[in-house]
Amino acid sequence: MKNSAHFCFAVLALSAAVSTQAARPVEFTVGSEYYNETYREYEQDGSRLMQQKGNLWSINAGVKYRFNDRHAAKLEGRYSRGKTDYTGSVQYITEDYIDDSASYGSATLKNAPRHAYDIRALYEYTLPINDRFSIAAGAGLGHRVLRDLSSRIDPNDYDRKNRTTYAQINTGVNIALPANFEISPRIAYNRAVKGRQYSYEPDQVETRMKQGGGQGIEVEVPISKKFANGSKISLTPFYRGWQVKESNFTVTEEYDSYGLGSIEPKNHTHEKGVRLQYSF
């Protein structure tokens, strides 16, 4: 989180070295989005271990500072919440062994609360090709947090939290259309630079695991209508995806000849939805 804030301040400091500002240097954006999320965990052999699927609503906000017509810095944030349905398999745990032979689908949990937020600081460069077409590219840092609150539905279940700091590079085009419409396809690649997974068992201390090595993509196609006062409204279908490797093994209980612990399996996340926002 601190890395993202430091990066944003460093980018904004570049304004002192730029002599020609854009006519309207500051742009604010507010909006909302609705998306379907599917989260899956996998065994080493590729078989599915569990799935969470549900719908989430988001509140989005951002600010963009243009140093001139080509250089800009952006700070974007999103807070999401919704409910997911869990599908997995029953595990029978005793002092002597763990029996996980039950088939996938033998355990379910409905309407578990899920919260998420994502904040990022980005630099953006825009290259005009002609009056109706330009190319944009950018890079920056982001921080995302996901929280599963299953214990609110089943007190015997456990809660989870994931924190990931990531780097992003992105590119896209801006195409002006008749009647002051615009379409701006964009694609981004995310790479995790630090990841932590936390588990909160009932009546137990926090279990912390390192889970880095994640990567993801974002694809969006904003369709915008510009107004005479310089503001615009945008409708944006989008896709966000992540693939994260298995975490390290964390010992939670130690005995004379062996130890018990936790590991977070490799997982994939898919988010598909639509965003409505207003920029002014």
Where are these regions (language model features)?
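Residues that define the transmembrane beta-barrel architecture of outer-membrane proteins
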Residues: K53-I59, N111-I119, F133, K161-A167, ...
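Predominantly the C-terminal beta-signal and adjacent terminal strand-loop region
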Residues: D203-F280
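Outer-membrane beta-barrel channels and translocator barrels
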Residues: A23, R66-R70, P128-R132, A176-N180, ...
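Membrane-embedded beta-strand positions of outer-membrane beta-barrel proteins
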Residues: F28-S32, A61, A73-G77, A121, ...
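Outer-membrane pore/translocation modules
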Residues: G82-Q168
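Extracellular loop and loop/strand-boundary signature of outer-membrane beta-barrel proteins
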Residues: R40-Q51, D85-T87, D96-N111, S150-R160, ...
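Short glycine/proline- and aromatic-enriched beta-strand/turn motifs that initiate or cap beta-hairpins
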Residues: Q21-G88, I93-Y97, K266, Q277-F280
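Transmembrane beta-strands of outer-membrane beta-barrel pores
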Residues: S32-T38, Y79-D85, Y125, L141-R147, ...
